[in-house]
């Protein structure tokens, strides 16, 4: 399995280099929506990741935010968000990342999240302790919500924002602090390494959370993901250290 992880790390670093090089340059906007932006650099970055991964594993499939490649029923499927935190990136907020995961027969077995601005690389694979820049990490041990830092994602569409606002209101009054950071993958990475105690969001996509999912679980936390009935290919997620009582 290590060769899969090594390939994901190589692709994530290359993608991160591309994003860092373009961070302060003029950006081409492909689509602008009420609460989201799609950039040409998103497409370019996924193309780079696809080229690197499928050159090594030509029979694998890739499922990404910017499209799919290959037979999606393949036993091996890469799940990719080439730029998680696109709005942050567009507004020159240096909080975004590359997220790459590998599923085998539907189970996530490898996860890599790379923050190119802080040079932080989270890596994880099934059955092993995850690492941040080569050092092992675990989730926090905070059990009291009143002492916790909770991240709540607000999503992108009206119906999902309306679903997330009540969660944010609950947590704001009960947790020590709440954060709305704009990158689900980094939220998951922060839960995994103990910076956050939990992350909640309604209406998230698989590519946003796949890599973080295995990081949180191999770091000792728990991840509860449920398909939403009102929106295709969207999920509700609670990722936490596994001991905190969120009262939900």
Indicate residue ranges for each PLM-predicted region.
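Solvent-exposed alpha-helices and their adjacent loops that cap or buttress functional pockets
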Residues: 30, 70-72, 105, 141-144, ...
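Short acidic/glycine-enriched loop/turn segments that link adjacent beta-strands
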Residues: 35, 118, 231-234
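DPxDG-like acidic metal-binding loop motif
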Residues: 72-131
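Residue-level signal for inorganic ion chemistry
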Residues: 19, 42, 53, 86, ...
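An extended, acidic
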Residues: 138-248
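N-terminal subdomain of lithium-sensitive/metallo-dependent phosphomonoesterases centered on the IMPase/IPPase/PAP
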Residues: 1-83
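Acidic active-site catalytic centers that drive phospho-/nucleotidyl reactions
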Residues: 42, 65, 81-84, 88, ...
């Amino acid at each position: 399995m290590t060769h899969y992880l090594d390939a994901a790390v190589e692709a994530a670093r290359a993608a991160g280099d591309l994003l860092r090089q373009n961070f302060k340059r003029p950006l081409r906007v492909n689509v602008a929506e009420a609460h989201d932006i799609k950039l040409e650099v998103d497409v370019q970055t996924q193309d780079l990741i696809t080229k690197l991964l499928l050159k090594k594993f030509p029979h694998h499939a890739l499922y990404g935010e910017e499209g799919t490649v290959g037979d999606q029923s393949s036993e091996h499927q890469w799940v990719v968000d080439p730029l998680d935190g696109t709005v942050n990136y567009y507004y020159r907020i240096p909080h975004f990342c590359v997220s790459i995961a590998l599923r085998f027969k539907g189970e996530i077995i490898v996860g890599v999240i790379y923050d190119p601005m802080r040079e932080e690389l989270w890596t994880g694979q099934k059955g092993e302790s995850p690492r941040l820049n080569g050092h092992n990490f675990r989730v926090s041990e905070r059990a009291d919500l009143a002492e916790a830092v909770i991240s709540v994602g607000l999503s992108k569409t009206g119906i999902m924002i309306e679903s997330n606002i009540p969660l944010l209101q609950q947590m704001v009054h009960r947790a020590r602090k709440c954060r709305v950071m704009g990158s689900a993958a980094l939220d998951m990475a922060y839960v995994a390494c103990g910076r956050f105690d939990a992350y909640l969001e309604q209406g998230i996509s698989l590519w946003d959370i796949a890599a973080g999912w295995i990081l949180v679980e191999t770091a000792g936390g728990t991840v509860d993901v449920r398909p939403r009935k009102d929106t295709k290919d969207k999920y509700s997620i609670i990722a936490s250290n596994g001991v905190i009582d969120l009262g939900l």
